[in-house]
């Protein structure tokens, strides 16, 4: 009879100890969770700050930086490729998207107003004459022009024409390819190299150059050679296309040989930045 109260008191004490222990565990868990949330918030803020910093740096670096501060050779080449390759890659990606869209619409019977407008815009930008009649779309000409210039080929030509981004024309005009301005369209802004096209950014320079190769009558044979590769289901590469670029330089084949040799010498370095 005496044992029963003792057992009851013992049970009560055990329950109290259990409650106290549980409260401490919950308190610690809450503190840990709060600490984790605080850590995540700080990490998130750091990520936002990094993105903002990247955005600011991207805006600042829209023009070609002064690459002469890098030692000549590999360090300067790497700095140049880090600067120009994103724009070349982006340009070719945009072209590929438009080309794929054209291919997907090639056998389409009915066109929506939005599709007509898009086709009209592409034809205009690539200087392809089109009456607007969807039954008479110049597909061969469109697909011959709306195509990539091999990324490594563009990078090699930019490096060759600009001295890896150190020429006065590249630094002052953002002109990486030695593109001359048309008569009556040249602007003689202070500090710019006269007689040559001036661009507001590296991106604009790359876009103008690629568009020039894809539209100018002088490079018709280059585009036809590229179209033949497509027809044969072969890859459009720098190795295949550099020697197909005729009429680009007054030096003729010797320039193509020089360009190809430069590409071969820097092929691995360029590939590492693609």
Swiss-Prot record:
Composition bias, Polar residues: 32-64
Binding site for ATP: 247-254
Transmembrane residue ranges: none
Key words of the record: ATP-binding, Nucleotide-binding
GO MF term (any one): amidase activity
Record keyword ATP-binding present: yes
Region (Disordered): 32-74
UniProt-listed SMART domains: LYZ2
Pfam families: Glucosaminidase
InterPro entries with a match to the protein in the record: Bax-like, MGlyc_endo_b_GlcNAc-like_dom
Tagged with keyword Nucleotide-binding: yes
Record protein name field: Protein bax
Native species: Escherichia coli (strain K12)
